[in-house]
């Protein structure tokens, strides 16, 4: 049941970052106080988000299973970050986006973030969950019942 997606999650991430930049300039509503601490917090969240996504992708590579959604999974990864969330790569992307929003410094820049999360759930996570259940059966169901989708 391999499905080919024309747009992969990192492309949605880049599109969301572009939308955030546009919203920041077009809808500069509720500007945050521009102090270095807000910027530092945003940069820290970006670094944490990238780290989460990279560590999670590394777990896939070490297990010999593809990172690209809907390619045939060869291993069910349940260790490391996957003990806490079933979707650490997507969670890392959301943390990165929240950090970017803090760095931009306006509520307007954060408006696309929930849309990104909704698109990821709708276009990827739901299908991936069904796909993994077909491949791994009860093993995946036990994992799914034990570990939350996000945190």
Region spans (language model):
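Extended, alpha-helix-rich binding/interface surfaces that flank or overlap catalytic cores
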Residues: 87
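Membrane-anchoring alpha-helices and their flanking helix-loop junctions
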Residues: 1-79, 91-151
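Solvent-exposed interhelical
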Residues: 82
């Amino acid at each position: 049941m391999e499905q080919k997606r024309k747009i992969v999650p990192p492309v949605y991430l880049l599109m969301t970052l572009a939308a955030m930049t546009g919203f920041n300039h077009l809808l500069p509503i509720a500007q945050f106080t521009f102090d270095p601490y807000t910027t530092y917090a945003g940069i820290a969240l970006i670094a944490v988000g990238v780290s989460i996504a990279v560590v999670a992708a590394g777990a896939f590579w070490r297990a010999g299973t593809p990172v690209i959604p809907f390619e045939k999974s060869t291993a069910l990864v349940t260790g490391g970050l996957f003990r806490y969330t079933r979707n650490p790569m997507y969670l890392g992307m959301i943390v990165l986006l929240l950090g970017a929003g803090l760095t931009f410094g306006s509520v307007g820049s954060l408006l696309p973030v929930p849309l990104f999360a909704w698109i990821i759930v709708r276009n990827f996570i739901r299908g991936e969950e069904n796909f993994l259940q077909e491949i791994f059966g009860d093993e995946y169901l036990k994992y799914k019942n034990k570990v939350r989708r996000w945190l």
